[in-house]
UniProtKB/Swiss-Prot annotation:
The lineage of its organism: Bacteria, Bacillati, Cyanobacteriota, Cyanophyceae, Oscillatoriophycideae. The keyword Transmembrane helix applies. PROSITE patterns: ATPASE_C. NCBIfam families: ATP_synt_c, PRK07354.1. This is ATP synthase subunit c. It is a multi-pass membrane protein. CDD domains: ATP-synt_Fo_c_ATPH (cd18183). GO terms for molecular function: lipid binding; proton-transporting ATP synthase activity, rotational mechanism. The gene is atpE.
């Protein structure tokens, strides 16, 4: 494998994980904060809010997992090598 392609693959893998985790991390923090605020305002709606929150967090976490999969492909099954 060309050293330039190997180095670019490692940098791209790091960016895929790093940038792929920033957005969902911020989104999860905002969603959790709003859920806590909503439960504090309407405690009787806790079950509905919690269920929606968990589903939303799962979808946001999927984006991070996609970034991890892309980085693993670039590191171990590099299509450019």
């Amino acid at each position: 494998m060309d050293p330039l392609i190997a180095a670019a693959s490692v940098v791209a893998a790091a960016l895929a994980v790093g940038l792929g985790a920033i957005g969902p991390g911020i989104g999860q923090g905002n969603a959790a904060g709003q859920a806590v605020e909503g439960i504090a305002r309407q405690p009787e709606a806790e079950g509905k809010i919690r269920g929606t929150l968990l589903l939303s967090l799962a979808f946001m976490e999927a984006l991070t997992i996609y970034g991890l999969v892309v980085s693993l492909v670039l590191l171990f099954a590099n299509p450019f090598a």
